[in-house]
Structures are given as structure tokens and as C-alpha cells.
Amino acid sequence: MKNAVKRIGVLTSGGDAPGMNACIRAVVRSANARGIECVGIRRGYQGLISGDIVEMDNASVSRIINRGGTILYSARCDEFRTKEGQEKAYATCKLIGLDGLVAIGGDGTFRGAQDLSKFGISVVGIPGTIDNDIVCTDYTIGFDTAANTAVECMDKLRDTMQSHERCSVVEVMGHRAGYLALYVGVAIGATAVLVPERSYDFEKHVAEKIRRARISGKTNFMIVVAEGAASGMAVGEQIKKENMERYDDIHSDCLLAPKYGNDEGY
């Protein structure tokens, strides 16, 4: 039985995530193993509009499995949000003979893929985002690496915190989702974790937790803040203000964990 699909495209869009290159490699080699041609679309949906494509075979994805970022590059594309932009992208798909498209990215990438599917293009979305905010999957590509990287950074920070008896506020990415902050907070044993899914009261969810930890004998504290919940700097300043009245022997810093980019747009 012959394949109905003979030629597909693959693109990465939005913020890059660890593991995207490994995913590109898997798509290309799986397609080639089934006799399906594969083309790479560079710079996401912008490349689909402008026709920025490259033929891909097994050799073109050799030795990229451990590389960070994405060899196909990524870019935001406001034009694709418009009907005219989507029509241009569809025209490119027909011009280069695509029977299907594989889109790797987060929620914005998936929205773009859904819009394109309305033109009759077969689309597969592969969740690649550190935010871990895509339904129907336990983990998205890049989430585990981002979580472990943040934990490694905070473990190193803790050594200094213990030496100086400090309270540190660490803001991590996640866009409007608190998965990354929550997983990291649990892994490092944070005193408090603030996530956008739940509103918080500073006195109840931060100050009181620090107070109880202090009474139990702890001399250093770490507060993890998801970027969608609050500003890490603002929380740190509020802790400093409280410290002037209650904890004059505790210092407060604010460290921004390494940022990888999110997938808000197409």
C-alpha cells in the first residue's frame, strides 16, 4: 500500500526549548525511513510565509541530538496572526507540495497549527516548551531540562544562603503556568512557592511561612516565584520591608533564574 503522504514540512516556533533538535532529528529520520520526503521550514511561521525552506535528509540532522536551541531557528510572526498571513502560509504549503506539517513548540505554536489546519493542511503538533502548559501530555519537550537546570543553579545558591543566613527570592519562567516553579520548589525544598494558578496573600503565604521556618530553627529561606504570579523583585522588596520590622538579622536578595523564552506568540 502506497503512502498517501509523500512530503512533509517541520518547523519550530516560539521560544526555543531543550530537546528541539532531537525532535527535529526524529521527525526527519522517521519520515525518511517510511519513504516520505521532509523539508525544514526555517524561522517558524515567518519562514512558512516567506518560503524559507531547506531540504532535509538523514545526513542533515546528523550529530544534532545533543545540541541546544533549534537548527531551524525560531521567530515571532505577527503576520501569521492575520488571515492574509495564514493564506500566504497555505499558498507556500501548496507551492512546495506539502501533504502535512509538523509544528514543534508551545501553546502559541499549537494555535498557529490549528489555524493552518482550517485550510485543509494535515498538521501534527509536538509539545516543545519549558512551560509544560500543553494538555494531554505529562511532560513537554524541554521541561525536564529546564527544571533540572534551575534546581542546579539554586542548589549552588543555597550554599551562599546558608553561609550568610539569607532569604533569597528566585523568579523562574513559565509564562502563565506555574508548573516549572512548582516542580523546582518541591525539588529544592523551598519555604514558599508562588504560582499564577492560585492567588496569594503575602502575609499568609510568604511572611507566615518564613516566620514558622524561623521558629523551627531554619536560618535560610528560599522563595520560588513563577513569572506569571508576581515579580520576584517586588516580592523581595516586600520581604525586605517586613524584615525591617521582624527579621533584622535576615537579608533578602532576588535572583532571576536562567531564562529560556516562552511561546506566547506564533
Map each language-model feature to its residues.
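Gly-rich Lys/Arg/Thr-decorated short loops/hinges at beta-loop-alpha junctions or inter-strand turns
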Residues: 7-10, 64-76, 128-138, 163-165, ...
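Glycine-rich oxoanion-binding loops at beta->alpha junctions
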Residues: 1-2, 48-103, 109, 141-153
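N-terminal phosphate-binding or glycine-rich loops at protein starts, especially the Walker A/P-loop
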Residues: 2-49
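Short gly/pro/ser/thr-enriched loop/turn and capping motifs at secondary-structure boundaries
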Residues: 45-48, 110, 129-134, 200-202
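Short glycine-rich or small-residue beta-strand-to-loop segments that form or flank ligand, phosphate
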Residues: 7-15, 70-75, 100-103, 168-171, ...
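A glycine- and small-aliphatic-rich helix-loop capping segment at beta-alpha/alpha-beta transitions
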Residues: 25-34, 54-60, 115-125, 141-145, ...
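Accessory alpha-helical/coil subdomains and C-terminal extensions
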Residues: 103-105, 111, 115, 122, ...
